[in-house]
Amino acid sequence: MAQPLFSKIEFIPKGHLYMNILKALFGNYSKKELKRIQPICDKVLALEDKYAAMSESELKNQTAVLKERLANGETTDDILPDAFAVCREGAWRVLGMKHYPVQIIGGIVLHQGRIAEMKTGEGKTLVATLPAYLNGLTGEGVHIVTVNDYLARRDSEWMGKLYRYLGLTTGLIVHSLDNEGRKKAYEADITYGTNNELGFDYLRDNMVVYKEQKVQRGHAYAIVDEVDSILIDEARTPLIISGKGDKSTDLYAKADKFARTLKVQRFEELDSKEDMEDYYAENDIDYVVDEKQKTATLTQNGVKKAEEFFGIENLTDPENLTIQHHVNQAIKAHGIMKLDVDYVVKDGEVIIVDEFTGRFMYGRRFNEGLHQAIEAKEGVKIQNESKTLATITFQNYFRLYKKLSGMTGTAQTEAEEFQEIYKLDVVEIPTNKPVQRIDLPDSVFKTEKGKFKNVIDQVVEAHEKGQPVLVGTISIEKSEELSKMLKKRGIKHNVLNAKQHEKEAEIVAQAGKLGAVTIATNMAGRGTDIILGGNAEFMAKASMRKQGFTDELIEESTGHAETDNEEILNARKTFDELNSKYKEEIKEEAEKVREAGGLYIIGTERHESRRIDNQLKGRAGRQGDPGVSKFFLSTEDDLMRLFGGDRMKMVMERLNVEDDMPIDAKLISNIIDSSQEKIELRNFGIRKDVLQYDDVLNKQREIIYGQRDQVLNGEDLHDTIYKMIEDTIDTSVKQYLPDGPREHWNLQSLKDYYKDWLIQDESRYDFDLEDLEDMEAEDIKNMLIEDAKAIYKENEELLPTETIREMERVYLLKNVDTHWMDHIDNMDQLKSGIRLRSYGQHDPVVEYRIEGFDMFDEMIESIREDTVKMMLVMPKKVYEVKKRQEAIEAAKRMALKQAQAAHQVVLNNGEDEEPKESPIEIALKREQVAQPTETSGDGTDTANKTIRKGKKVGRNDPCPCGSGKKYKKCCGKDE
């Protein structure tokens, strides 16, 4: 490899120097907090001998002792040392694991409602048991949140053994669970589940009709694993329960066709697009893409072309907003969204690729029509638009908890955001063993081709000496390109991206074997440790698969749930034997890997977020193991292009730097770090902006869900309905009979408004417009209110009280849900439109808040009005239906009575009588006469046909149906 240029250059920007001075003067926040926490940790450690000396029954009984202390007025902080010490001893007896001092510190931080930053391999799963056990003693419920079902199930079974041993119950929330199972799981002291499932359960709970259908029981305390992924990366992605919406229009295809005719200009520098309108016009530029801001905007030239293409005069007119929206989404689909980076096309569907993990996000869709625009771009079926039934962001869901905490290996870079949005401090927990990973400076190349050549050279060199290598890429496309290059060099390797994710855990687990080479996108195994020398657990499972064990049994072999199933017990025995065997075998290999330098992490591009880069680095140097990390960059990388890559490339060309000659300089790394900080600040600003808008809807959601709960919990609505009647009539009278001159009154419209609900029967209700003209508006209002209440009172007397109360409840909930769904859509449209307006000095968020609450008030009025209408009309209709049903039942009873009274059914004219039918059979036959005629598959009628037994009945004979009439006047009249 060529000698690096400027290799001795060291540069520290003023900002970095300033921060270092601040740290020197005031000390590091985490270090100060750790000093405060250490005495609590010491108390826990001091109790070790006390609880170790206890018998099984004595230790188990400590849960009851601690609960009693809480009942007597002590707080969880008071009992923390004892609770942690009990849990620690229990873990040793049940799991064979004892919390290290640093893990106790991590547990204390979590209990205090903070974020514990703990490096990879430091045992976060075990750490969570300490605060979970302590807070589980309160009986209010603890939620331990993971990013997927696999981790939730694994941790609940594994750590559940400890909780059950100590007398606490555990629950598990996974996608396949039914409502009854969910309710039981939430009733447990400690519940494991994914962020998606918990959020969706909350939304579904606020759509139920009966409180017994709710599954959650409150939000007391949550411990969020991989907290940065859930609260930062997914903060902008709302949880949405959707229903079938309108059919997608052909505008998506038309807008896509238009977008393909346009000429685009891409900007990579913020300062390079000033005063560019003349340039756009001269070069026929139709739309501009700002890759840094991720926006696509039509130029004046593009606007004119759109008006010509769609045959409209002014694209910005309000009546053309729909066309404008579709065009904007089409140019965004073509200009911003990239195939195999932002999304993939699989089996005729567009599937989102998570920007932070590289995983496919099945079931998720881009909102505001962007997904349909991409479908049009890729030529796949454009799916129907959906209607939002309920929605919430993770930001607002997790802020429901009285106490929130989290764990991650990378949180410091987002410490400000955690504090500002969630009021969560980040405390860095020291590792149990010193980190031995060496982080080498970045190498920057002139071209991507030169960079990849050096990456492959590094991989080959490391592979030949037995050092395992994990190569991180930021897209599927790049991972596959590197894979082709390695194949040409004859290097055996594994590729892990969203297209080949089925064996993710196994590939990641074996990435630490001697000479292993793994190429992975950002998804590379959070939740699965890379162990030097190989992972004995996965080797044991592979061996069991060869022996013929089913996948189900192999899964159960590492489970911790209690069972007496012989097959499962045998599988566990086999696994334990194989696991022990492979652990011994890999010891020698692990030592060789350590001698080779440990795991070598190669980053092929910097991510927008330093945190994602740190996660990749953190795969190496686990639990004091050696390791190396290095990033290989080029001036053509996306991040470099956006922040001066072109200028850097020009400098390198002037210096005649070859494509494969790297520049290793602290200056470059600092420039990149600074660029990442700028992007992080921008993304924080975007998330903050999203939250400001969502807070408006969230406040409205709290009001609606709170009042909904009052209805569910059995609040008597009689007085509420009376108040609704008064408010509804007051609003309508003010609308049609406004203050001021009477010529502005519209009595006819007022009468039309009340038609069919207040004025149900004009003969009964004397609504004489001439008489009303002489009355005051206030008197008219009072008269209408009095009459409405009279109708309501009459309705109450028609049906049982419990029926009326149930109708009030169900109709009110139905109207709340229907109007809330429409309101969510209206708020979305308001948000989209408000950003297009120019308010001068006005803040768009303030305008959104004002208009949003005006719309909310209108929604409340609509709920009130529809509920009043239903309660004045429906009880009478229900009563009439009930009366009709009673009349039908009475007729049936009469028919049965007549049949029973008949002393003779069939006369056989002296012949032997056939067996007589019972009176009930006869009555049923009579009832069948009234049944409708159906048509069979061949078009023939399948109506009931008279089947006679014995001799034909004469026309003047008594009718055999038992009516007492002659046959010709009864059943035989049509013959």
PLM regions with names:
Residues 93, 329-338, 585-587, 734, ...:
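Flexible, glycine/threonine-enriched loop-and-boundary segments that flank and lead into catalytic domains
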Residues 949-968, 972:
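Short Cys/His-rich zinc-binding micro-motifs
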Residues 2, 6-13, 18-656, 705-706, ...:
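Conserved P-loop NTPase motor core
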Residues 471, 519, 820, 856, ...:
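Hydrophobic, well-ordered secondary-structure elements that form the walls
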Residues 211, 946-948:
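Short, P/G- and charge-enriched loop/turn segments at secondary-structure junctions
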Residues 466-479, 714, 769-773, 960:
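Short, Lys/Glu-rich amphipathic helical modules
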Residues 51, 343-351, 357-364, 594, ...:
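Extended, charged helical/alpha-beta scaffold domains that provide interaction surfaces
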